[in-house]
């Protein structure tokens, strides 16, 4: 298997971001973003997706976390698209249900080349610590637009907002892992009857 690794740098007047990842890693996460709760969530992506993920961000968090969170999602999406390459041999689709105590979430992903986000998380709180829960939409929208995936995210139940979003990110990591696994029966084959994605 050829290395499925990528490094992407994205610099704007609002953020300076670097992402390095290995899709066939050991689930190691290294983060320095100035947004601690997002780092906790990205660690779930790395561990449950078995992706080595290194993210640094110097953003305008003195204003708020919006630009950093959205731009990190964009840059991770770009890096995954780069690492996946032509998509030949991958399973393409992934899904996962993950519980955490009273919370349960489902994530379904398709590496279709068609960006689309359907997300329903009825948060029980507007903030988790200092983190604005509305920003998770910005993270996933940025990711979807630049990874070129269709993503359905549903929190099916939960009373604790931290549990709600943690189950989402764990399920997201596991769905990514499933979709990006190489299928030995599909070696060199595009997972689409169209012949392209």
Swiss-Prot record:
Its EC number is 4.2.1.19. CDD domains: IGPD. It comes from the Bacteria. It is found in: Cytoplasm. It catalyses: D-erythro-1-(imidazol-4-yl)glycerol 3-phosphate = 3-(imidazol-4-yl)-2-oxopropyl phosphate + H2O. Keywords: Amino-acid biosynthesis, Cytoplasm, Histidine biosynthesis, Lyase. Its main location: cytoplasm. SUPFAM superfamilies: Ribosomal protein S5 domain 2-like. Signal peptide: none annotated. GO terms for cellular component: cytoplasm. InterPro entries: IGPD_sf, ImidazoleglycerolP_deHydtase, ImidazoleglycerP_deHydtase_CS, Ribosomal_Su5_D2-typ_SF. GO terms for biological process: L-histidine biosynthetic process. Pathway: Amino-acid biosynthesis; L-histidine biosynthesis; L-histidine from 5-phospho-alpha-D-ribose 1-diphosphate: step 6/9. It is an enzyme of class 4 (lyase). One of its GO terms (molecular function) is imidazoleglycerol-phosphate dehydratase activity. Belongs to the imidazoleglycerol-phosphate dehydratase family. HAMAP family: HisB. NCBIfam families: PRK00951.1-1 (NF002106), PRK00951.1-5 (NF002109), PRK00951.2-1 (NF002111), PRK00951.2-4 (NF002114). This is Imidazoleglycerol-phosphate dehydratase.
């Amino acid at each position: 298997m050829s290395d499925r690794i990528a490094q992407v740098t994205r610099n704007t007047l609002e953020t300076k971001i670097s992402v390095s990842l290995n899709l066939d890693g050991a689930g190691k996460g290294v983060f320095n973003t100035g947004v601690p709760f997002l780092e906790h969530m990205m660690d779930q992506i790395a561990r449950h997706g078995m992706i080595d993920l290194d993210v640094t961000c110097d953003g305008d968090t003195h204003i708020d976390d919006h630009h950093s969170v959205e731009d990190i999602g964009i840059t991770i999406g770009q890096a995954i698209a780069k690492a996946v390459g032509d998509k030949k041999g991958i399973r393409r689709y992934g899904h996962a249900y993950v519980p955490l105590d009273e919370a349960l979430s489902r994530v379904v992903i398709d590496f279709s080349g068609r960006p689309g986000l359907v997300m329903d998380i009825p948060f029980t709180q507007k903030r988790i610590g200092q983190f604005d829960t509305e920003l998770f939409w910005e993270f996933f929208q940025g990711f979807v637009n630049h990874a070129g995936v269709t993503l359905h995210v549903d929190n099916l139940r939960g009373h604790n907002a931290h549990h709600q979003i943690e189950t989402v990110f764990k399920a997201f990591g596991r769905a990514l892992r499933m979709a990006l696994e190489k299928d030995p029966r599909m070696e060199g084959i595009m997972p689409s009857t169209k012949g392209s994605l």
